Amino acid sequence: MPIQNNLQKFNDLRKEYPVFVYDSYHYEIADNGNLVVSFSFFVGNAIRYNPIVYIKKHSLFDDFYTSGNLEKLQDFVFSIGMIELLSYWKSTCSPIIEVRCGSLDEEAVSFWKKLYFNGLGEFFYTNSIEISIDEMVTIVPQLFTSAKKHFFGLKDETIVPIGGGKDSVVTLEELRLAKPLIPLIINPRKATLETLKAAGMDGNFLEIQREIDPVLLELNAKGFLNGHTPFSAMLAFYSLLLGVLSGRKNIALSNESSANEATVAGTEINHQYSKSYEFEADFRRYVKRYLSDELNYYSFLRPLSELQIARLFSQYPQYFSVFKSCNAGSKQDIWCCNCSKCLFTFIILSPFIAPEKMREIFGENLFENPSLLYILQELCGLTAEKPFECVGTVDEVCVALAQTIKKYEKLPVLLQYFAKTELYTKYAAVDLNEQLRHFEPKHFLNELEINQLIDKINKLQR
């Protein structure tokens, strides 16, 4: 991720645009049965944003729509607006956010400030902006009160968001053995739809179509501030809304323990902050305090590492030809084979899938590409930063590389490089089977899920 010195631009924009306003939210059931959600944000007189989201019609929503409880969605939609606004606020980084709808108390304001600050850690870093959480923004609510919690009588069934990569495949396959579930997709693409087809679930899923206001894209083109925002936090709030609409209380994410590691060594800057245990714990407290005691948002894979997930995924060959984790190639539904996400995925799966099959999945053997050497060094912790992508820990990458070397008679160029480092000597001695049986204690799984996962990983062998 290129670092740009935009500190002066940051300061200038904050002076020119001192107040960002969250003016209103609106939702209604359209004639076609979709729930249409919209927000109104503005900055001064010149910049107005009106993003729109479509919750696609589904028969599971019928009971809620006929219950007369539509007004109970207000606090959920308001909260979605609080996370949606971040994509627009970051263009000007206005020092004040004025909230003219909904209600927030002091604890809620603290939650949002922490989420904004940590969720934008990468954004601030890559724009060379050094600022404290107190200096970043002041949130001024119109109503400084607590929201009212709601009861819906939700079923003990589960929504599983599907991203098209290996992690959500593992969650889907493991959870479907134990309880009824339904997949959720935001902005479906070929990989997500093909994943559901391979699972035999393509005829029944929940769908959200989210649109970015084109005004934001115009500002980006004009040189306003731009960068990473915490997508997984946005997904978290949308999944709550879908839980209420569908009458399901559980939302099972696929965020693993590896997401807790900082992206920049020696700091708390984490590309995956909104996938971390810290965010998950904060979010659950927010939901219980302000929205509903019934909803259970958690990550089913939290006790596991990327290495363990890769091993589990290797047991589902029906997904090999359809899963895609490459952001650069997502629109074309390809592995670009030239980015950190592609190389990481190739590395983490290689101990468990034969080289010939890996070449078939990716279209080439990425270990043979010398132009990926610097990315390899980033993934191995040989640089100050890991890639700003959803990748595993340095330890996991090094263990996977050391194990993969044992599978080759003639080493490709990237494995040759790693074999000559001190890292190889260190990680070649690691017991892979012991790594595969580790169970991270910080999680929110119930006892049945704990036993299910422990039983599964105890049976894992290379």
Task: Please tell me what each predicted stretch does.
Residues 61, 187-321, 331:
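ATP-dependent adenylate-handling ligase core
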Residues 167:
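Hydrophobic/small residue at the entry helix of a nucleotide-binding pocket
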Residues 2-39, 46, 289, 293, ...:
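ATP/NTP-dependent adenylation/nucleotidyl-transfer catalytic domains that generate, transfer
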Residues 157-162, 170-172:
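Core alpha-helical transmembrane segments of integral membrane proteins
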Residues 170, 234, 238, 340-347:
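Short amphipathic alpha-helical face segments that pack within enzyme cores
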Residues 87-99, 243-251, 350-360, 405-411:
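Short helix-capping/linker segments at secondary-structure and domain boundaries
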